[in-house]
Amino acid sequence: MPEYLKMEKQDLINEFEAVRKEYEALRSLHLSLDMSRGKPGFDNMDLSEKMFDLVGNDTGFKNIDGIDCRNYGGLDGLIEMKNLFAEILELNPEQIIVGGNSSLNMMFDTIAQAMTHGMGGAPWYECKERKFLCPVPGYDRHFAIAQYFGFKLIPIAMNAEGPDMDAIEEWIKDETVKGIWCVPKYSNPNGITYSDAVVKRMAALKPAARDFRIFWDDAYAVHHLYDTKDELLNIYDECVKCGNPDLPIIFTSSSKITFPGAGVAAQAASPNNVSMLKGRMQYQTIGPDKLNQLRHARMFRNIQDVEKHMKKLADKLRPKFDAVLFELDIQLKGLGVASWTKPNGGYFISLDVLEGCAKRVTELCANAGMTLTPAGATYPYGIDPKDSNIRIAPSFPSVDEITKAAKVLCVAVKYAALEKIINN
């Protein structure tokens, strides 16, 4: 099949009629498919069920320090979990704060604290024109937090190495720019891992705002899909080399390692930032869920245990990614109306369709019984200026369901592209 944009009008009409019939046939199946969020499938979560047997009357409730995890206390988490997250993030345990089940919650709280009490400076609410840098396409819930707190969201284009550092270095000359969101490894949604050059330039930033912070969400630190594993330079070490130890606030969690609703989250930072954050936390909580932390600590004694577990998860997840990529290659390659990422890890595939077609594609999919992340969600304010990006989340459905969903998606992409080309 030649590229659609190079075809004669009548050939396009004929192709559209064939695609329309294929689409109507799929609609008649009354499918109910969901690729809207990066939720682990039941098969992935089942691999962690054994942890519920690791804490109880038979196994005891005390950690290695003799702390009874049923009781109050332990503001910044159990030492076992600090050690584990320190291994994952390649930091010192003293730099780790272990929280509840949600790293997003910790991000929200950190910004809320900065709004009222500053981040080593004046409270952020005093800056009326405050701005936050948002690499795009990116994570909608990051953008939503900054928007909730009244920041103007500044899109920063992503490229093959990470965010556009030239643009970032220009924007941080403005002292009203207070931070940047980063998903540096297997980024959401395009699966890019920041290059060494990008990490080094990020660490060397000299913002006009001394309270500028890098919100480094290392959500997919150990989430490899294939034997080819991306490597990410240590942002904290690089910041220390550049005299910027306080610049990054690092987040991660076990949400997509064990249970999204009952994992363990952590944040990490310089000793100065950790002291500041813990000083504020003491007014917020007496401590996190230590029993859940103990369950995780007993299941994962070290990074090697995590890596073995993640290989099992990858074995479950990989066929789902492969099924989507296979359909994209078979149905859309060479048509000139779509491009997509082939990530080595993470939870998403980023699909770019013909400009002006993303909303129509998601509409067509919805009408055929398939739910996708809303078009535009990967951009601030839900507005994709090109209306072209769609985030694909293959993790939750079964391989059979994923294959059906990918077929619907590909037909919808062709339908929307032909419709637009013919009408123009």
At which residue positions do the language-model features occur?
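N-terminal "arm"/small-domain region of PLP-dependent enzymes with the aminotransferase-like
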Residues: 2-76, 86-87, 367-370
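Short amphipathic alpha-helices in soluble, non-transmembrane regions
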Residues: 361-367, 405-410
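Short, solvent-exposed loop/turn segments at secondary-structure junctions
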Residues: 38-42, 103-104, 138-140, 161, ...
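Conserved core of the PLP fold type I
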Residues: 67-210, 221-243, 408-410, 414-423
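Conserved glycine-rich beta-strand-loop-beta hairpin in the small C-terminal domain of fold type I
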Residues: 311-325, 337-352, 366
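Conserved PLP-binding active-site segment of the aspartate aminotransferase-like
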Residues: 350-355, 372-414
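Conserved core segment of the aminotransferase class I/II
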Residues: 99, 237-318, 330-331, 418
